[in-house]
From Swiss-Prot:
It comes from the Eukaryota. Residues 484-506, 602-612 have a biased composition (Polar residues). This is CCR4-NOT transcription complex subunit 10. Residues 72-106 form a coiled coil.
Amino acid sequence: MAADKAADQGAEKHDGAGTSGITDQEKELSSSALQAFLAGNYDACLQHLNTLQDINKDDYKITLNTAVAEFCKSNQTTTDNLRQTLNQLKNQVHSAVEEMDGLDDVENSMLYYNQAVILYHLRQYTEAISVGEKLYQFIEPFEEKFAQAVCFLLVDLYLLTYQAEKALHLLAVLEKMISQGNNNSKNGKNESGNNTNKDSSNQKAESGALIEVAKSKIHQYKVRAYIQMKSLKACKREIKSVMNTAGNSAPSLFLKSNFEYLRGNYRKAVKLLNSANIAEHPGFMKTGECLRCMFWNNLGCIHFAMGKHNLGIFYFKKALQENDNACAQLGTGSSDPGKKFSGRPMCTLLTNKRYELLYNCGIQLLHIGRPLAAFECLIEAVQVYHSNPRLWLRIAECCIAANKGTSEQETKGLPSKKGIVQSIVGQGYHRKIVLASQSIQNVVYNDGQSSAIPVASMEFAAICLRNALLLLPEDQQEPKQENGSKPNNQLGGNTENSESSEACSNKSHEGDKFIAAPPSSPLKKQELENLRCSILACSAYVALALGDNLMALNHADKLLQQPKLSGSLKFLGHLYAAEALISLDRISDAITHLNPENVTDVSLGISSNEQDQGSDKGENEAMESSGKQTPQCYPSSVTSARTMMLFNLGSAYCLRSEYDKARKCLHQAASLIHPKEIPPEAILLAVYLELQNGNTQLALQIIKRNQLLPSVKTLSDMRKKPVFQPVHSLQPIQMPTFTAVQRK
């Protein structure tokens, strides 16, 4: 579509080139060339242009129009030739775009606009915006049609680079421009009085149709902008306008489906997608958009949000197949290195969405529990989206998940007693019980290879997390807990992402600062700080796994210093700091972190009253029930979290030989949970305490029964304590190592 605009606008230079120094013959040739171009008769157009070039060899505009006509004659497949000609003409007029500083450059505006269109299709969005913004400075002298084309191109570029607020400002300018143009045409009609004829009425009808098309495009762009900003109340108003102006076209239905998806109305979103008539779409060879690929991708996003991850990955794979089929039809282009963008229509340079789809597949596979497959997808996507800190975090999470087995895997090979007894040796009087070692410190994961090699190792996870932290801006304000990633969502030809937990509690202000995180939607300031907290928590965990206790302590301390830290991450921060301090033989400092009173909340995000203050969108309430499920193995309440604190506190007291305090912590913790929920580390701690106390037989009874033996008074006294109310579940933790004793 933009290629057509480039061609049309380039040809229009004939009509606008009339000056006092031009002859009647040149005017006639120019007009004939324009009419032939608009009629699609490019051979006749080129003949007229060649005649003009013979008459006026110094006019570069004729060369420009010739290049555009030849480009259209080739069905827009000679992109490299057009690009080369535009660069030569630009060097002839100006050495750089930055030199555009006067009204004389208005004469060269068509050259720069065509160059911006080329850059747009080559995905060089920053350079295209630079050219477009220079053109926008001189927009007043432009013809109305050309001014609108410049504005629409800039709006598209702003949305592709996730600058939604700039896009909305430009759309307001466009609305005013169209409104003024409409009023001027009405005034002109009134002045002409009875002199109107059939031609003028046809022209008026054509102008009215163009205005309606422009208004419809404005409404669609507004919906895309509001979706990026997660401003659903404003989006709802614009959706109605889109449906009124564009009807049940595929773009309008895809946009409305995206809107319902963000509201949490997933069944309605699926119904809208299914109602879109994809067969009527012109096809990616004409528009550059593979609608079938978008359809399957959007279904995958919706099922991801519903928690149906296996269905989601099925649809994402279908989208990848459609994308690969489209790319196969397009071919690889010219074999000549200088013609790599030629041999296919220019609009199809934007067809390939492989890396966006790989990003989606990676996030989905991570949720399914297939971290290695997710790693392969995300490591390919990060080659393109290397500036996205959240993507680096997801890759690190793949590495962590791949190197941390489930509870069943962790006890594999330890045949009995929940992994407490490793083996039994000897017979009769010499019969001995060998206890399992629980030590996991200083594990080497990379087998001697460089940690910079992209493999799913903990060393590579540390590099990914370091990259993520470096990509975050320094400003820190108002963090709240991030609640997982959504796949990005391509609707109506654009790539968008929604995170339901974030969108439901954030208010879109005009002054909000957005941080780009392609291919996802940009991050708001609050979301950015949530991301910072998640990265710090993962960094502390990875450092502990690698035995880098000083770095782990540094990350844990930074995590605990974050303002408005969520309860779950605060809990993790204290545990990670305590584990690092114990390894550094700073037991007293570790005991301070292991105080159960530090745990007052284990929720995943900010409190409900803060969410109410941060949201003015009544529609967002439906998004709370996204269908996602938190794994059952997570501590689910303050009670279970404090229990874990007490078990670890008892371990710390043992290291200081304060066995009475350790025993008190152990039985206090055991009184708060069901006996079957007591971890094997706590059983080993009880065995260790009894052995230190000389009660060998009692220690053997604990191992035999695989449970803590209740003390005479302590346990009954502890049960009189009030039970804490359960709250939300939280993330898994790495427990500090308990001391295991092996009898000889």
